[in-house]
Amino acid sequence: MNNNYHTQINRPNMLNEIAANNNLLNNKNNQTNQLNNNQYNNQYNNQNNNQNYPQNYPQNSQQNFQQNSQQNHQQNYQQNYPQKFPHQQNNITEDLVDIELSDSKESGSEYPQSVQQTHQQPIQNNPSIPNNQPNQINQYNQQPNQYNHQQPNQFTQNQPNQPNQPNQHNQYSQHNQPNQSNQPNQYNQNNQFAQPNQYNQSGQLNHTNKINKQIQKQLDKNQPEKIPSKPEKNQKQSHKPKLPPTMQHGPLPIHGMPIQHMPPQLPMQTEYCKKSNSLFDYIIIPIALVLVFLFLVHPKTFQNNW
């Protein structure tokens, strides 16, 4: 039962594939061999997709396949269609000229004469090809420059000894004036610091200095004289040696090294043992040490002696 069920369902699909293959073989035998392998495979796949499931793949439908084939044909093979472009001659825009393009490699007799002339002119005027014919399109380039040739130069005409004359264009320029560096500075007239001895000429600065000195003298007289304070008798004066100012804050800095601020170092205080004059230190202690040595270290010698 299962085998019959599956064969009944798959039978229409198999028949469709067989029919599609037969159609492709017949078409291939009838047509000339113009299709490549890629085009043949695409056509085979598109036919199968259209027959079996065109709804799932709308891009593979027959209409899209025809449109794509037409576009590819237009790109690969140039069709005979008119192309228009403006043609200029003698500074007059003529009517648009129709040009037909074709694949045939024939002589240029099919093109109109006006188009043949335009194609032949740049070849004749090419500098690499020896030809002395004038270029009709570039007639404005052959005309002399009105400003450089026809009109005389106003600055150079009928002026004798032109290099010795002063520069007319730069006559207002300060850099071209003679001895400009020796002239007084015009821009620093209002600058008080630029003019020399401005205050000394009028005498105001010297007068103010005298007044300030007199005021300082009066203030010094009014202030009481400062008497140095004497140390009291009860206060003990320190007899520490005075260090130089460079050594108060540690050693001198080394060249290229930062200064290390260290606290002042106090002098070292050495403690000496007190002198002992008692008999205890010189007599009793040595006798006790000898007895300990005899009883503990050498007991045999002690017994033999006694």
From Swiss-Prot:
Transmembrane segments: 279-299
Classification of source organism: Viruses, Varidnaviria, Bamfordvirae, Nucleocytoviricota, Megaviricetes
Segments of this protein annotated with the region Disordered: 44-76, 103-204, 216-249
Membrane topology: Single-pass membrane protein
Keywords: Coiled coil, Membrane, Transmembrane, Transmembrane helix
Coiled coil: 13-39
Organism: Acanthamoeba polyphaga mimivirus (APMV)
Subcellular location: Membrane
GO cellular component: membrane
Protein name stated in the entry: Uncharacterized protein R335
Low complexity compositional bias, start-end: 119-201
Composition bias, Basic and acidic residues: 218-235
Keyword Transmembrane applies: yes
